[in-house]
Amino acid sequence: MASVAESSFPLLCQIKTQRRINSSTLRHSRVSYHDLPSGSLSFRSRSFVLGHRCKCVSRVEASGSDDDEPEDALQATIDKSKKVLAMQRNLLHQIAERRKLVSSIKESTPDLDDAKASSKQESASSVNANTDATKKEIMDGDANGSVSPSTYGKSSLSKEPEAKTFSPSTESLKNRKQSSASVISSSPVTSPQKPSDVATNGKPWSSVVASSVDPPYKPSSVMTSPEKTSDPVTSPGKPSKSRAGAFWSDPLPSYLTKAPQTSTMKTEKYVEKTPDVASSETNEPGKDEEKPPPLAGANVMNVILVAAECAPFSKTGGLGDVAGALPKSLARRGHRVMVVVPRYAEYAEAKDLGVRKRYKVAGQDMEVMYFHAFIDGVDFVFIDSPEFRHLSNNIYGGNRLDILKRMVLFCKAAVEVPWYVPCGGVCYGDGNLAFIANDWHTALLPVYLKAYYRDHGIMKYTRSVLVIHNIAHQGRGPVDDFSYVDLPSHYLDSFKLYDPVGGEHFNIFAAGLKAADRVLTVSHGYSWEVKTLEGGWGLHNIINENDWKFRGIVNGIDTQEWNPEFDTYLHSDDYTNYSLENLHIGKPQCKAALQKELGLPVRPDVPLIGFIGRLDHQKGVDLIAEAVPWMMSQDVQLVMLGTGRPDLEEVLRQMEHQYRDKARGWVGFSVKTAHRITAGADILLMPSRFEPCGLNQLYAMNYGTIPVVHAVGGLRDTVQQFDPYSETGLGWTFDSAEAGKLIHALGNCLLTYREYKESWEGLQRRGMTQDLSWDNAAEKYEEVLVAAKYHW
């Protein structure tokens, strides 16, 4: 009898004895539905013949025939029928409103034809699901009126997620008839080729919804309880599959002219959210939270970034990171972007384009070849020449004149790339084009663009932007070096710069600053510093004269490479990937793995301090050396990684020898070790005397490592001083390059680490939740390019 109850068959038998009844002795008949007056519903059945031990249970007839069933059961059935009809009327009202809404949307937006078809199909699916639910409610309600509550007291409709509507095939019906002769299903949707004949005010359901023949379909929609079916709109988050053959044929009955009570706002939201659901389902795992930036729209341009290095092909510092990451973010915004860089070695991705050009440098004809690779939506063009080959380990190597000749050749070839290099079969051309030159190595490009082309009416609409990454390197030399750049004599004044110490000299950066349409620095703080006597390195007067075209934009970071959740260098040696959610587990594990790898005592309670950078006076390594004795007295561990000046390299070796159980000095550079120190350290030191932008502090904050920095340049822009009262800030800063100032800031940091864990966790959380990606910086670069484009 459990199977009978679960299948919700309309004929229920009350067994009066414990004797098992053979199913072969049961005889059954079909249930017929006849038209009745409005507000009533008739069911007629024949009784089961169960022998002398089984009592027949008959259905109640609405015509008033004699019956043994109590009158309250009859009244309950009638009330249920009225409720069902009311629900059906409300449902059809809402369907009609949906049709009107979709039709209006189609008229205003022709592209939503597919959405209209989807809405109709889902409406038909909702009708089928609600029809099954209501009929099932009648059956169970009638059963509750006829059978003991102890046996059938709970309706199957109360099971919200478990009950599902489905349409079995004809073969399954035949099998059911053969296997069970005791009962037969009277559900109106059991046959996929025969629509329901339930009467609705004289008209069958088949004249309102569904075609004459519906193909079998797989079960998909979940039937809910009657109390939750007032709104037929399927949830946008979980759209149900509908039958493809549903359509609307006859007009609605007269009693369905009442306005619906349900608002159409949900329907509008459904239509809007449908594309989002589809797109979220097609996203790859791990990338669903990554959303593309907005497109440039009318501001889309052809952009060519020219640099002496570009990660991952060639890199010595932050310039390589910028050249490798910024173009990809610009391309994601819809721009056509190219990167031009020397070909220092053979790169597997780059293919020879077969383009050959010859340029004269210092009286010699030099041939260049162009190689091309298309990576992440960006065209990478490599300029090949014997002057560039075999310099991958020392791209700025050679004497002053050798470097100057290489850069002259590189800039001459780069400025003509949009004419001669077919990327994807089509050259960029010189219309709607902007060059982005970087540092003094490519500062000749704006000068060549103006002298060779724009002064002669060629490339009139091409613009140039010069980015200052480090103004200390300027391409200086004697005035006689002007003969190597191959420019008209009246351009000599652009290169001349008077130095109070060395007198008048040749300066490539000075000429580039004057010729460029816009000038950028890699942080707001650095854009202010280069205008001062101390920070301008002799170029401050030129910068102040051209202040109108200056702007600072903070660099971003590659959030795919420098991300603790996906860092490939944390996959082995007991390291682990982590995110903000499991920071309290993942970071201590990386710390223990780093201590173990470097041979330090594995102590989770000891603060681990790290330094990653060039061993140079600029980076403040000498300040760290002065503070080492104090640090070792504070029961901390110190790890330093870098290469540079020999005397500072020796400082690292002596430090490790003297404090063997507390300090490690790694002379050299390893990308893997840099990632692991960033992940395993608690604190990162950056006491740079000047820092145009700095990237290590950005990497550290993204990994939950707290920076202690000298407040200069980009460090001042990116690391806000921690305020314990308002619980704001990202780290600790000190205002002058002195060992005492460094010790004071680091002492406060260590105190917070040991005594105020909640504040420390807040610092980590704020650092890791920042948007440090290149998408923000790319938007600001786009603003500068547009400003240069419309500057005449």
Swiss-Prot record:
The Swiss-Prot or TrEMBL record describes its family as follows: Belongs to the glycosyltransferase 1 family. Bacterial/plant glycogen synthase subfamily.
Record's protein name: Starch synthase 2, chloroplastic/amyloplastic
- The annotated regions of Basic and acidic residues compositional bias extend over 266-275
The protein's job, in short, is: Involved in the synthesis of glycan chains within amylopectin in leaves. Is required to produce chains with a degree of polymerization of 12 to 25 (DP12-DP25).
Q: What happens when the gene is disrupted?
A: Reduced plant growth under short day photopheriod conditions and starch granules with alterated morphology.
Pathway(s) the chain acts in: Glycan biosynthesis; starch biosynthesis
Say if the entry is tagged with keyword Plastid: yes
Tissues in which the UniProt entry reports expression: Expressed in roots, leaves and flowers.
- Which residues lie in Polar residues bias regions? 145-156, 221-233
This protein's species is: Arabidopsis thaliana
One term of GO molecular function? alpha-1,4-glucan glucosyltransferase (ADP-glucose donor) activity
List all Low complexity biased stretches: 179-192
Residues annotated as binding ADP-alpha-D-glucose: K315
What Pfam families has UniProt attached to this entry? Answer: Glyco_trans_1_4, Glyco_transf_5
Question: What reaction does this enzyme carry out catalytically?
Answer: [(1->4)-alpha-D-glucosyl](n) + ADP-alpha-D-glucose = [(1->4)-alpha-D-glucosyl](n+1) + ADP + H(+)
